[in-house]
């Protein structure tokens, strides 16, 4: 079995990148695709309050390793994709197991657009702007970036670069709320929309989302009072390219409130690991119905240059300011990274990255250095 696996990897490294075409007659097509992502590295974390340090040898397979099938039958298209670690239906109940990343079908009306139903990325997922590989290719989310993937069941309409979606509100995808609420609650379907413009030298995306949660207050005594938590986010991404595409500059900005309700923004620190750790990842509601809102403003930048067909150099960084009503101080988190992707073949790449992060919580400072390399096989 080991010999077969090594042979398969060698074959993938030797050929250009392409999905495996199972069937194609022009009108109808089926292909298989996938990616396997592993990492190895070293991390060093410092906790300023306890004056302790952590040194970590890092290795593993990333949870966004995946395999999928795409199909097209006339005006109908669809996709089914399995991820190594993916919440499928009710979030945490399947959050550490293999699950469905994509499961959707769409019908095209030609110039009138397309209607999609199923699980796919929401319009506010902002992939393609920041190349950071930390936190499962998280794009500096929590350190100035924005979520690169937010897969939910939804009904989505797409036309001429515009996407409008009604999205399921499965609270298990995000930590939700704490204090004052019963286990139940009433949510409205989350609304998401975006507009994307793309040509060979420019990528622009503007996105926004809104949701709300109503719940009965159960402290100090149960009654019929209701409190409402409003949640929203807006994001802007801009990525022009220069020198016939050899150089690019990405600018990404996001502002939102109470995005814990749907899990697209977070306040974090890094302890010298590939994954980040959350800081107060819930919205609090007091006994009188007062909502302890969590607001975040974030910005990230990336500059990249393709030295040749094999090697690129990328430098990036970001800053996020979190304003949490329940705390007496704000939280500032920032990161910088240097990356040098090496394209061994069309199917295989090595991506070394050096990252420094810092998080400031009143008098508590948390800093980290991580040097890691991702190995990525794609077909």
What is each of the regions a protein language model found here?
Residues 34-42, 80-84, 117-121, 164-168, ...:
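Transmembrane beta-barrel strands of outer-membrane/channel proteins
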